[in-house]
Design a protein with these regions (language model features):
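N-terminal glycine-rich phosphate-binding loop and ensuing alpha1 helix
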Residues: 2, 7-61
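Residues at the C-termini of beta-strands that transition into short coil/loop
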Residues: 36, 81, 135
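Short phosphate-binding loop-to-helix
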Residues: 58, 64-123
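Residue-level preference for the first positions of well-ordered beta-strands
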Residues: 13-15, 102, 131
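Short, high-confidence coil segments that cap the C-terminus of an alpha-helix
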Residues: 54, 100, 127-131
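Short beta-strand segments
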Residues: 19, 105-107, 134-137
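Conserved core of the sugar-phosphate nucleotidyltransferase
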Residues: 113-150
């Protein structure tokens, strides 16, 4: 996580938020699925915490099982009780609860997210635009119509 104010005033917090829901239509319980002995949400959280551009990282959930795991393992977690259709909705609700100048939405099912990708996104962010996305170029035609690739 960030140790000094780079590109921002010291009071400008950069916050990583990781939406994590239990009732996924494709894979219920995905945040707590075991990946080589470690739940997915732990892997995502740990990788996000490696991003030097982030001051704080929070898991956002509507599920007590995920919250309980996070509390037992010293992971910052916030229960979002409002009905949210998407992870982005959950992040929008969290903005009302958290202090920060810039919020980075980190997908809860990216256990191998590269912390440097987060750093590059934060560093390149243009405050006059308001929103930025990191992405990977799709090179195979079939991936354009695959609902599992977003």
């Amino acid at each position: 996580m960030r140790t000094q104010a780079e590109e921002y005033n010291e009071s400008d917090l950069v916050v990583g938020v990781i939406p994590a829901r239990w009732k996924s239509s494709r894979f219920e319980g995905k945040p707590l699925v075991d990946i080589s002995g470690i739940p997915m949400i732990r892997r995502v959280y740990d990788r996000a915490c490696m991003a030097q551009s982030l001051d704080k990282v929070y898991v956002l959930t509507d599920d007590n099982r995920i919250n309980d795991y996070c509390q037992r393992h010293d992971i910052n977690c916030i229960i979002i009780t409002e009905l949210c259709r998407t992870g982005t909705d959950r992040c929008a609700h969290a903005l009302k609860l958290l202090e920060g100048k810039l919020f980075v939405n980190i997908q809860g099912d990216e256990p191998l997210i590269n912390p440097e990708a987060i750093n590059r996104l934060v560093k390149s962010f243009d405050h006059s635009i308001g929103v930025a996305n990191a992405y990977t170029k799709i090179n195979q035609d079939y991936k354009f119509t695959d609902d599992n690739i977003v």
